Structure formats: structure tokens, C-alpha cells
Amino acid sequence: LTSYHAFVERQITASAYLQVLVDEKPYTEDDISKYYDDNADSYAGNGIEKSDVKMVNVRHILIQPEGKNDDGTYTDEAWAEAEKKANDLLTEWQNGEHTEDSFAFMAAENSQDPGSVENGGLYEDIYPGKMVDEFDAWCFDPARQPGDTGIVKTSYGYHIMYFSSTGEHAYWYVRAEEDYLNELSVSVLQEVAAKFEVTESEQNAAIVD
């Protein structure tokens, strides 16, 4: 057990040291843009297009219809009731403090989306195409501003929307930056490893000058 703890400590120390070395190699947004361009075919093949549209952060409260037809679709009455509840909740919020915090509280109390209810309805770093079309269209309306609200109907139900903020970068940039840094880490690790000779015996492995 002692040797295992020592191994873990060495791994943590080595990882931290590698990160320090990587951090010492500055890069610019132009470097990331060039990295994307150099690998554009690969990114495009994965549906990651270069775009000026930045990622966004949005809160929502999902109100699902309750009541289905024999074919499994929601009844008209169920849709109408869900729409009314969504409008009533939005009006209640507008007549109250109408802050992002109060919206988050309302989401935690009312949203039927298990993926965001515990986080006040928040979805961060949404990029075009991540959500269903109607949700997506509302989020990326060019006129959208922080604090905007609205109601959107999707196949899941009615979404009471709150636009929180626009992110710093577009999705392609974040993905390219992540890949760039991963490659940089590998390159730095190889540079460090090349400075040392490793003994062939795994049992007596050691690093020597």
C-alpha cells in the first residue's frame, strides 16, 4: 500500500510538472485558428464548422403535457394545459423580482427537465445544433440579449426561456483549443522523456542523467 501511495504521489507530481511546462508555452487565438484550419477536414467530418457564433448560457423551465392519445402523442387538451401553465409561471416571474436568481429558483421548483432542474434550469456552453431546432433557434436569434425571456414549444413540451449570457468563444474554437493543448502536452512530454535514458529492466527501472 505504501508503494502504491508513493506511485500515486509521483504521478500527481509529474502531472503537475507537465502542466507547468505546458503553461510556459504561450499561444494566441491565431494559433488556435490555424490549428483548426490545418485540421478543417477532420473537424468538418465531425460536424464542427468554423463560425463566428459564440456559445451561450441559457436557463429554462420545461413544462411537459400530461395526457396522451392511444398512439402515444399528447392530447390537444394536455398541450393547452401545459401552455397555460408555462404562461402563468412566466407571468408570475415577471410580476415578482424578475431576476436570474428568481428564475433559477422557479426552475428548481417547477421544471420537469431532469438534466437541468438541480442547476436552476441552466445549460451552459450551448452551441448551434446541440439542442432541438426550436430551442436552438430561440437561443441563437441574432437579437438575443441577456435577460431576454420567452416561451418555446418543442416535442418535449413548453420551455420557459431565460437568456443568461453569451460565451467568450465559438464551439469550434473550444474544441480546437482542447485538441491543440492535448497535442502540446504530448509534445512537451516527449521532449522531457528524450532527455533521459530509461533502464530496460522494469523491475529496476530508474531515470538517470
Placement of each model-derived feature along the sequence:
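PPIase-associated folding chaperone regions across multiple families
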Residues: 1-81, 108, 128-209
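Peptidyl-prolyl cis-trans isomerase
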Residues: 88-133, 164-171
